[in-house]
Amino acid sequence: QEPSFEVGYIAGLMTETNNVGFVGGQKSPTIDQFDYGYRAGVAYAAKELGKEINVDVQYANSFSDAAIGKAIALKMYDSCDIVFHAAGNVGNGVIAAAGEKDKWVIGVDRDQYDLDPDHVLTSAVKRVGKAIQIVTEKVMNGENLGGTTQEFTTADGCVGIAPTSDKNVPADILEKTAAIEEKIISGEIVVPYDEETYNAFIAELNA
């Protein structure tokens, strides 16, 4: 959810319509992390800017049907100028819609800049190689990780925004985002991961 917060923050700072979107695959605790992390990042930016930014959230109920993703996004882009997807192959349809409508899309899991350099604003990425390195080091040090679930965070260097973000995101916004990342690493910002933690985050933000 941490890189989702960062890309949400970027979307919030960069939207010109004050409407941004999120397309999820299927509702699940995993996709909730992307959804609510993104919403929280947008809200944080809106608070900084002293304005309201609406987040249109829709689910495709699929991770494979790119046509559904495209249809949802084409409609979203009537009001939204930036859409983030966490929807597997459905996201390819969202990227296609961004190209057609000449709007921004935010990629997921890997740096998706190569799919459409003119319309992929940034991506919330998992650095799998870094995670493998950490696990390998733990095993080499004699830790028994059998049957355990390993969680990786921004602080581990395993998640973050894509290295190509500087292609389309202005330098001053990247600097602000780097400062946000430091606050996440230090624990000053605790990124929500579901509806309950999101509502608590918003209540504290507006306190």
Language-model regions: role of each:
Residues 1-207:
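A residue-level marker of the well-folded mature domains of exported/periplasmic proteins
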